[in-house]
UniProtKB/Swiss-Prot annotation:
Cellular component, GO annotation: cytosol
Cofactor: Mg(2+)
EC number: 2.7.7.8
Coarse class of the protein's main subcellular location: cytoplasm
Keywords, sorted A to Z: Cytoplasm, Magnesium, Metal-binding, Nucleotidyltransferase, RNA-binding, Transferase
Alphabetized SMART domains for the sequence: KH (SM00322), S1 (SM00316)
Family statement: Belongs to the polyribonucleotide nucleotidyltransferase family.
GO biological process, one term: mRNA catabolic process
InterPro entries, sorted: ExoRNase_PH_dom1, ExoRNase_PH_dom2, ExoRNase_PH_dom2_sf, KH_dom, KH_dom_type_1, KH_dom_type_1_sf, NA-bd_OB-fold, PNPase
Pfam families noted in UniProt: KH_1, PNPase, RNase_PH, RNase_PH_C, S1
Any one GO molecular-function label of the UniProt entry: magnesium ion binding
Protein's UniProt name: Polyribonucleotide nucleotidyltransferase
Organism name: Chlorobium phaeovibrioides (strain DSM 265 / 1930)
Xref: PANTHER family: POLYRIBONUCLEOTIDE NUCLEOTIDYLTRANSFERASE (PTHR11252), POLYRIBONUCLEOTIDE NUCLEOTIDYLTRANSFERASE 1, MITOCHONDRIAL (PTHR11252:SF0)
Length: 732
C-alpha cells in the first residue's frame, strides 16, 4: 500500500512524505519531496540480541548525494561516486546527532540509516529533508523510537524569517541555521549568523520549532496510516541488590574525589583505582553470595558478577555524584563556579615560518594554530549538487590521540574532526575579509595538543589570533565557548567552559562563537527531552558573558590585526594587461609563464579579464616578474633603452640581443663600441646582459618579418631603464 501525505509550510513551500512504493524490504523507507528535490531514507535494525557487555548504540547514519540527481557526472577520473564528500559527512552528522537521543535508553541493536538524494532541483538543499526522511522511515518501521523528529533550516532575508530557504535566498540571508527537534523540544542546532543578538537567535529557533511541530504531526499521520506495530523491547534489568552494593561501596569515595580539585590525569588515575577496587569487591561478594541453585532460579543474578555491568553501575554512581554536587552546591570538578572560565594563556608567532600562528591554552585544552596564505590557485575546488565553486577560506582541525594521553591510529580524517573544523571555520568566516579586500586564499590549521573539553572553541580563538598575528585584516575578533547543562526535574544548572567529564556526564553541549556585536556560529546537542526556552535563554546570556571575558584576554594579547603580513607570506601585486596579450604571457604550452616563475620565484595567476596577480615572498621577485610581464606586452619604441641578454654572436656581423622577452634585435658590429671592433666575441659573451637602444624598426622585404636594429654605443650615456632619470628622459 502506497501512502502519501503532504503539508504546506507557507511561503510557497510544500513537503510530502511517501512510503510503500520503494525499498520495501527495509524495516522502514520513506521518500520526502520538496520542489523537485527528493530523498529516500531507509532504516534497518538488527534483531540479533546485543552482548550484555555492550554499552553503546551502534547507529550508523549515511547521507549520499547522487550526481544523477542533478543530471551531472561525478568529477575526476572515475565517473562513479566514491567515498563521501565533506558536505555529505557534515549532513550525516547533523542527522545522527538529532536522531540518536530519541532511541530508547539501552537500545543497543545495530542500526543503519541510509539517506540517498535521488533528485535535486539545485535550489532546495536536501540535507534537512534527509533528517525528516530518516525520522519518518524509523516511525513507519517496527523499530522502537520515542518521538518523531524533524529538521528544518531557518534563514532571514530583509528581516523576514524563512523555512528551508532556497540556495538563492540563502545568498541574501544573514542567518543559516539547521534545527532538529520533536514536537515538544529542540534537540539539535547548528549554523552560522552575521553577528545576530541572543534574542534574535531565540526568535529564529522558535520560528523553526513551529515548522518542526507541523512536520512531526505529518509523520504521526503517516505512521498512523501504516499502523505497523513496534517490536518488543525492554532494556536490560540489573538486580537491585547490585546497585545498592555498588552505591555503598564507592559513593562516599567518589564524592570525596569529586569535591577535590584535581588535574585531569590525576583525577582519571584515582577514579580508575576506585573502579578497580569496587569491581573486585563486587565480584567477590556476589560470587560467594549466590549458589548455583540461586542462579538457576533467577538467571539475572549472574549479571551481578558481570564486570561490564558492574562498571556501568559504578559509572552511574559517579554521574549522580557529580550532578548532585553541581545542583546542590554549585561546585564543579575543578573547583570553579558555574559561570567561571578556566585560566587562559596566549602566545603569538610561535611558528617562525608560518604566515601567522598562535598557541591558545584554556585550562587543560590547548590548540596550536597556523595560518598559510596562498593565491587563487591554492583555493579548494568544491563540487556539490547545488553549487560548484572555489573555496578560498578553510580551517582544518586535527585531534591526535596524544592530546588525551592515548595511543591511537593516525589515518584518514575522522568525521568528528571534519565537523569540529567546519564549525570553527564558519565562526571565523563571518568576519574574514572579502576577496576584493584581501585576495588571498587562507588556510588555518588547528592542531589540538591537549584536550579537556571545548577544543573546537579553542580552535576558534586560536584561529582568530593566528590570523591577526599574520596581518589578515579581520573585521573583528571572534571567541568561542562551550556551555553545559545539568538538569534533574525542575532543577538545572548552566555551566560555562565545560570540561570533558562535564560534557560526558551532563545533558547538553552548546557551543557559541561570536564577536562583541553578535553571534557568528553555534552548535548544540541535547541528551534529554524537555529543554525549556528559558534555559536556552540563560545559556545564551551566560555564553555571551563568557565570550566577552575571553575576548578581553585575546585583545590584551593583540588588540588588532598586525599592519604588515608575515615576513615569509607572499605579497600579491595585481596588474592589468590587454586581453589579447594573455596568450603572449602564458606562451606555448605555458612555457613563458613557467620561465618567469623559474627566474623570479613568483607565482603568477591570470584571469580571463586580463588581471594578472603576482605572488612572491620577496619584493625583488615581484618587481622582476612585473618588469618581465610589462616588457612582454610592451610595444618596442625607437629611442627606448633596454637591458637585454646576448643570445647569439656572429663575429663578423654582430650580436643578437633579446631586448624584450621573446624578441631579439641585431646589434651590428659597428654599433658595439665607439672604437673599431674586429671580432664581436672579444667584446660580448652569450648570456651577458647589456644595455641597448632601439634605433630602427623595419620589415624585411623578403620575409615580411619585423627587424629590430639595436645599438650599444648609442646607449652608453643613457640612464638605465627603470630609473627616475630614464623616466624623465622618456617624458621629455
Amino acid at each position: 500500500m502506497i501512502i502519501t501525505k503532504e503539508i504546506d509550510l507557507g511561503q510557497g513551500k510544500t513537503i510530502s512524505i511517501e512510503t510503500g512504493r520503494m525499498a520495501k524490504q527495509a524495516d522502514g523507507a520513506t521518500v520526502v519531496r520538496m520542489g523537485d528535490t527528493m530523498v529516500i531514507a531507509t532504516v534497518v535494525s538488527s534483531k540479533k540480541t546485543p552482548s550484555p557487555n555492550q554499552d553503546f548504540f551502534p547507529l550508523q547514519v549515511e547521507y549520499r548525494e547522487k550526481y544523477y540527481a542533478a543530471g551531472k557526472f561525478p568529477g575526476g577520473f572515475f565517473k562513479r561516486e566514491a567515498r563521501p564528500s565533506e558536505k555529505e559527512i557534515l549532513s550525516a552528522r547533523l542527522i545522527d546527532r538529532a536522531l540518536r537521543p530519541l532511541f530508547p535508553t539501552g537500545y543497543y541493536y545495530e542500526t543503519q540509516v541510509i539517506i540517498n538524494v535521488i533528485s535535486s532541483d539545485q535550489q532546495n538543499d536536501a540535507d534537512v529533508l534527509g533528517g525528516l526522511a530518516a525520522s519518518a522511515a524509523i516511525m513507519v518501521s517496527d523499530i522502537p523510537f520515542e518521538n518523531a523528529m524533524s529538521e528544518v533550516r531557518v534563514g532571514r532575508v530583509n528581516g523576514q524569517f524563512i523555512i528551508n530557504p532556497t540556495i538563492d535566498e540563502l545568498e541574501g540571508s544573514d542567518i543559516d541555521i539547521s534545527i532538529g527537534g520533536t514536537a515538544g523540544t529542540i534537540c539539535m542546532l547548528e549554523g552560522e549568523m552575521k553577528e545576530i543578538s541572543e534574542a534574535e537567535m531565540l526568535e529564529a529557533i522558535r520560528f523553526g520549532h513551529e515548522a518542526i511541530k507541523k512536520l512531526c504531526a505529518l509523520q504521526d499521520s503517516v505512521q498512523a496510516a501504516v499502523a505497523k506495530a513496534k517490536r518488543p523491547f525492554a532494556p536490560l534489568q540489573v538486580p537491585s541488590e547490585l546497585g545498592a552494593f555498588i552505591s555503598d561501596a564507592c559513593k562516599a569515595r567518589l564524592k570525596e574525589l569529586a569535591y577535590t580539585a584535581l588535574a585531569k590525569e590525576e583525577r582519571a588515575e584515582r577514579t580508575k583505582e576506585i573502579y578497580g577496587e569496587t569491581l573486585k569487591s563486587a565480584v567477590e561478594h556476589f560470587s560467594a553470595a549466590f549458589s548455583s541453585e540461586d542462579l538457576a532460579a533467577d538467571p539475572s543474578k549472574a549479571l551481578c558478577t558481570n564486570e561490564h555491568i558492574i562498571e556501568e553501575e559504578i559509572h552511574s554512581v559517579e554521574k549522580d555524584v557529580m550532578r548532585r554536587m553541581i545542583l546542590d552546591d554549585a561546585k564543579r570538578l575543578d573547583g570553579r563556579t558555574l559561570d567561571q572560565v578556566r585560566p587562559i594563556s596566549i602566545d603569538l608567532g610561535v611558528i617562525p615560518r608560518a604566515h601567522g600562528s598562535a598557541l591558545f591554552t584554556r585550562g587543560e585544552t590547548q590548540a596550536l594554530v597556523a595560518v598559510t596564505l596562498g593565491t587563487k590557485k591554492d583555493a579548494q575546488s568544491v563540487d556539490t549538487l547545488t553549487n560548484s565553486a572555489d573555496k578560498r577560506f578553510m580551517l582544518h582541525y586535527n585531534f591526535p590521540p596524544f592530546s588525551v594521553g592515548e595511543v591511537g591510529r593516525l589515518g584518514t580524517t575522522g568525521r568528528r574532526e571534519i565537523g569540529h573544523g567546519n564549525l570553527a571555520e564558519r565562526a571565523i568566516r563571518m568576519v574574514a575579509p572579502t576577496e576584493q579586500e584581501f585576495p588571498y586564499t587562507i588556510r588555518i590549521v588547528s592542531e589540538i595538543l591537549e584536550s579537556n573539553g571545548s577544543s573546537s572553541m579553542a580552535s576558534v580563538c586560536g584561529g582568530t589570533l593566528a590570523l591577526m598575528d599574520g596581518g589578515v585584516p579581520l573585521k573583528k575578533a571572534v571567541s568561542g565557548i562551550a556551555m553545559g547543562l545539568i538538569k534533574e526535574g525542575s532543577e538545572y544548572a548552566v555551566l560555562s567552559d565545560i570540561l570533558g567529564n562535564e560534557d560526558h556526564l551532563g545533558d547538553m553541549d552548546f557551543k557559541v562563537s561570536g564577536t562583541r556585536d553578535g553571534i557568528t556560529a553555534c552548535q548544540m546537542d541535547i541528551k534529554i527531552d524537555g529543554l525549556d526556552y528559558h534555559i536556552l535563554e540563560t545559556a545564551l546570556e551566560q555564553a555571551r558573558r563568557g565570550r566577552f571575558h575571553i575576548l578581553d584576554k585575546m585583545e590584551e594579547a593583540i588588540p588588532a590585526s598586525r599592519e604588515d603580513l608575515a615576513h615569509y607570506a607572499p605579497r600579491l601585486t595585481a596588474i592589468q594587461v590587454p586581453v589579447e596579450s594573455i596568450g603572449l604571457i602564458i606562451g606555448k604550452g605555458g612555457e613563458t609563464i613557467r620561465s618567469i616563475t623559474e627566474e623570479t620565484g613568483a607565482e603568477i595567476n591570470i584571469e580571463d579579464d586580463g588581471t594578472v596577480t603576482i605572488a612572491c615572498s620577496s619584493n625583488e621577485g615581484t618587481k622582476g616578474a612585473v618588469e618581465i610581464i610589462k616588457a612582454l606586452i610592451a610595444k618596442p619604441e625607437v629611442g627606448t633603452v633596454y637591458i637585454g641578454k646576448v643570445r647569439d654572436i656572429r663575429d663578423e656581423l654582430g650580436a643578437f640581443v633579446e631586448f624584450i622577452p621573446k624578441t631579439d634585435g641585431l646589434v651590428h658590429i659597428s654599433e658595439i663600441a665607439n672604437e673599431r671592433v674586429a671580432k664581436v666575441s672579444d667584446h660580448l659573451k652569450v648570456g651577458e646582459r647589456v644595455k641597448v637602444k632601439l634605433v630602427d624598426i623595419r620589415k624585411d622585404p623578403r620575409t615580411g618579418k619585423t627587424r629590430f636594429a639595436l645599438s650599444i654605443k648609442a646607449a652608453l650615456d643613457a640612464p638605465d631603464p627603470g630609473t627616475e632619470a630614464a623616466a624623465a628622459e622618456t617624458n621629455s
